[in-house]
Amino acid sequence: MEILAMRKVACSIIFLIGSALPLALHAQFTHSSPLPERIDINTASREEVRELPISTALADALYAHRIAKGYYRSVYEILEVPGMDKRTFEEIKGLIAISHPEERREVSKYILLLQERLAAEESPREGAIDEWEDLLLSPLNINRAGVDDILLLEGVTAVDAVSAVKHRRFLGSIRYTSALRDAKYLTPYGFRNMRNYIVTTDDETDERSLSMHYRMRYDHEDLWLGDEGSYSYRVDALNAELEELESDTVDNLYTSLTNAGWTPEQIYGLKQKLINEREALKVARTPGAVSNRLRFRYKNHVKLGARIVSQPGDDDELIKQYAMFTGGPFLDKLVIGNYRVTIGQGLLFDNTDEERARLTQRIEGLFGDLTDTDEFKLSGIAAEGRLAILHPLVFYSRDRKDGILNRDGTVNSYILTQPRAAFGDVFSQEDYGGELRIDLSDMLIIPLGTYVSLNAYETQMSKPLRPDTAEVDIPFDKDRLDDLNYLMMPSGDKRTYLGTSFRTVYRNVSLEGEYVSQQEHGYGYVLKALVQFNTFYVIYMKRHYGLDFFNPYSRAFSEQSKFDDTVVEKDYRLLDPLYADLQDLPIPKAEDGHYFETRYQIAQNLTITKAYVDVWRNLAYDLDNVRIQGELEYRPVFPLRFRLKQKWQVKQLPKAILATTSRTQETTLRVFALVAGDYLSLEVRYGRVRLTPNELYNGNLLMEGNYLDAAWEHNFSDFLSVVGGAAVWDAGSMSQWIFEDVGIDFLYGEGKKYYVTVKDRLSENISLRFKVRRKSTSYPHTGIYGSSNEYHYGDDVPVLVRDFTDVRDQLSYNLQIDVRW
């Protein structure tokens, strides 16, 4: 009933404001006199576009559409502009001219826009952003592209790609990209996503003998006094553990380890390891991460790339480089150095350090790698070819990996942590395998875009993997690391995986899937179905990952990572507090689930932008979980949009005797407005989590949190813009998350922050982004020993305990410079 009441109130507010604001904004709709000459809509400034005999709001929409989507290739494309009707179009059609300036002039702008895609709930991964940037520099010739080539493009489905190829076959060739509008089953959304990355002739691609792209990024962020998980917090946790390892006290960690069979030498080794980690964190206190990246391209045949990243606290820099050769008669790509491989649904192989929950789409194939991925990077040689209907991909890599070492020198687990300290490069690993894809397109009655593949890879470690709770968990304490996701990890120095994947497309329906079996262990599979129309789509995904299936390179669709909701989240239950970083391993948890997703444009001004239901089971404990989320957008007039999002989640958490249940609700209202060329947004969220009654919670069964966020962007010109944002929050006992600029920020306690970002395209080939942010967080500590102002007796000494508030202030700034020539 509470949820229903909240939804009714929110809907009432939306429609009340939506009814009043059209009148308030009516002043923008002014009319100008007819023009004696035509305006080139592709080169005109905002002020020149406003001289058209249309409303100011519609003129701004015409201009904004060009900035966001690229140059108009036909006068009829202005019909796509929100608010443009056929009558207005006929009135201004004769007043508009369409020129065809070089697309490369807009590359710097689109690269900046791509960076902002990272600030989204289901954002693309860094590797995908890199590939799309490369396609902006070297567009895809749609007249020579195959289905798999088109699927590299952002937001393009298998149905879209097949429809584009079929339409090209029907026409013989595509003269203008706008001709793809008429492709059957290609949605307007799919076409818009393609448009900035494709051309129709080789003459339109950048065929200069040599082109280069250099990027420098500097991140100055104080990780010492940050939020939970800050370096100062970690140092305190390490100091507390070191105190417990002193041998002159009773009933401490030293005693427990001795009773568990640890020798004094082994305990001393653990102590020295913790000291080394603490000192590395202190060194990393000085902020300042620097990244330098350089990419060369000789026509479309040779690509070279190199990147050096220096992180505070790490003695060794992350160095990546590759050389890629393309365009051979039977060899599509040959890569030497660092590279990425993605096969099928990512169940067998997708080497990235990034985790993305509910990822329904990924780009497949072989790519050079200059991303931040370190632990799961590949270093060696790989090739992708084409021989008739056979499309082979093979790879070999030898690289050093980070991990937790047992006392006997074996590897307990992979780990991602920063700084790497004692975990860095402790063993080496060889990975080799590949995919043999068989293209069945147009064979007999088999539809275009159909393939089946045989996939395999093998891992050889220099030190065997041997998971052992006695090497990670504090012995004899209350909480035990007894989760089967950990206990059923395989042992040994060699692992072999065999699998198959497939895809087929029929009209507006696509089916995809992948199955992988780990030799002498478990298996996993993913199935995906898509049905799409112009205003509506439905995705269904089924996944199953067995308890005894462990694949460190698996990044298939999942809701939780492997060690999420386990004891490793509690650093005080571990022999080394930094072992808590195990929860960041991006490997899917053993789960079985069903996922449904849809988008539906109900009317021109009313759209369900995205809604999904995920029902999954934690196979380690047979616990069922549900997550439901939906977002509704209402646009009463073009410059104004409201978005109301609601999330419900019921999650069961394993406990020693009986599982507990948390029930989460989040309501978010966002308002967007485009006023006189400025972009304004306002967001408010309220969240609450209801817990299962437990004496440990002292009656605190309800956690609540909220925040208010506002952002504004002003375009001073086509090249210079400034973005400003501010937020205040009271997260209570829960955590909140918020998107800003090009990333995500987690909110704890109470606080406020503001940021300013300057984006400037200094020339057609030089762009700059500078951001400064100030964040202040307060952590109230109340009722530590019951009511305030009570005496606590430690060592028979009375100490008055008072409530207090911990305040942390952070100042960070980031600079990114892109230069192309």
Describe each PLM feature range.
Residues 3-13:
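Bacterial N-terminal signal peptides that target proteins for export
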Residues 27-314, 318-322, 329, 338-342:
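Compositionally biased linear targeting/interaction segments
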Residues 235-267, 345, 349-372, 396-428, ...:
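A subset of solvent-exposed loop/turn segments in beta-rich extracellular surface proteins, enriched
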Residues 280-287, 376-378, 427-460, 464-469, ...:
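Exposed, low-structure sequence patches enriched in small/polar residues
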Residues 296, 302, 312-399, 531-554:
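Outer membrane beta-barrel
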Residues 307-319, 369-372, 422-427, 516-522:
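Outer-membrane beta-barrel proteins
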